[in-house]
Regions:
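PLD/PLD-like phosphodiesterase catalytic module centered on the HKD motif
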Residues: 1-172
Length: 172
């Protein structure tokens, strides 16, 4: 489906510095491991490059800080809509934030899921973030792979459609 890429010094970052997210039109493949960025910050920066965006988020779980970040981006006009797919078990563990989550996200689907992927489909371009980080706050090193390759975003969209068929939908 897509060819492996070579990591160059420009793509590799250390945890000593906060990674810089480049415009995916100029750097179509970006990879870094860091404890200096959160997933919500990456989404925020990508919307600068994509324009107002629709989000499709897959995560094992989400936390209040991440949900509030998405809410803030919606209020700023950076996000048109956001859909969330996350795991049944995680939903039970994060029950106290479920009301906030279902208010912020256009649709929330529960299913068996451990993937952590975000599609940022903007007016100017579409980007996909593959990450080890859930939509939670953490201080651990996490891996992030950002690409604007359309076949990857399309694959994620198709997979989400299949997952929706096996889920419980909490908002329409």
């Amino acid at each position: 489906m897509f060819a492996p890429f070579l990591l160059t010094n420009k793509l590799m970052h250390t945890t000593e510095n906060k990674p810089t997210i480049h415009d995916p039109r100029e750097e179509p493949t970006q990879f870094f491991i860091t404890d200096r960025l959160q997933l919500g910050e990456i989404i925020e920066q990508l919307t600068v490059f994509t324009g107002k965006a629709d989000l499709k988020i897959m995560s094992f779980s989400v936390g209040e800080e991440f949900v509030r970040k998405i809410h803030t981006l919606k209020k700023k006009g950076r996000i048109k809509s956001a859909e969330l797919v996350f795991d049944f078990k995680a939903a039970e563990k994060t029950a106290r934030t479920n009301t906030l989550t279902t208010t912020v996200f256009y649709r929330v689907y529960y299913c068996t899921n451990h993937a952590k992927v975000v599609v940022v489909a903007g007016e100017q371009q579409t980007c996909t973030v593959l990450t080890s980080q859930n939509g939670t706050r953490g201080t651990r090193n996490e891996a992030y792979f950002i690409t604007n390759k359309g076949d990857i975003a399309e694959y994620v969209r198709r997979k989400l459609e299949k997952l929706r068929a096996s889920r419980v939908n909490t908002g329409d």
